């Protein structure tokens, strides 16, 4: 099992931006790593505490039709001066990839 991660920031704490960024980041992770949905074991998503208008995993699940993949959401630990409005995704895969 391997893990792949990525991060993206959004312009505003609004559903539109959360949805667009989540789908974009997930799609980019799949594309850059030549992954198929079948390779995914589970997905972990964290957001900074200034994102509270929507669940990124909901939009990813709907857009990519992920019915049997576990998705968990977490709040990112707050650190003074850290990057605001940030969504991070960690995907666990059952495939060997060259990193």
Which residue stretches match the model-derived regions?
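Terminal domain-initiation and capping elements
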Residues: 1-99
């Amino acid at each position: 099992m391997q893990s792949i991660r990525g991060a993206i920031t959004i312009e505003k704490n609004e559903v539109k931006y959360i949805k667009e960024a989540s789908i974009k980041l997930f799609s980019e992770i799949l594309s850059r790593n030549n992954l198929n949905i079948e390779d995914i074991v589970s997905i972990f998503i964290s957001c900074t505490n200034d994102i509270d208008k929507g669940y990124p995993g909901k939009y990813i699940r709907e857009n990519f039709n992920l019915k049997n993949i576990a998705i968990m959401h977490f709040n990112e630990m707050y650190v003074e001066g850290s990057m605001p409005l940030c969504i991070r995704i960690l995907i666990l895969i059952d495939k060997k990839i060259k990193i």
